[in-house]
Amino acid sequence: MALRNIRKYGDDVLRKECREVEEIDKRLLVLIKDMLETMYDADGVGLAAPQVGILKRLFVIDIGDGPLVFINPEIIETSGKQIDEEGCLSLPGKMEEVMRPNYVRARALNEKGQEFEIEAEELLARAILHEYDHLNGTLFIDRVNK
């Protein structure tokens, strides 16, 4: 396992749409472990593959309840509203208030290739939606409440 370089705001890779993961192989499993290690080292709660320069539809999250891996995620449903401050490992030191849905239902594959659905509220919903945005080239500053 190794720490990966977190791409910072201004890097073109952060604005690109990611491709689906076609195969969960040894290289992808190493990437997932590296992403988790990098996220924990940076005191983050989430990290998406484009943040380490990989244009794959993959992100990891840990809000304190253990790591979650999302491969080829889909957002099925959202509802409600919440406004809270967000930050991003690609924009160190920047915090802004962002309105997001308070509830999300998502579907993805885990690192074993098993499909799962998750229902989340509050911080976990915010983290899922924040990381999902990265896969489409969107940063939280694009959603700042003006």
Give the predicted meaning of each segment.
Residues 1-146:
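Positively charged
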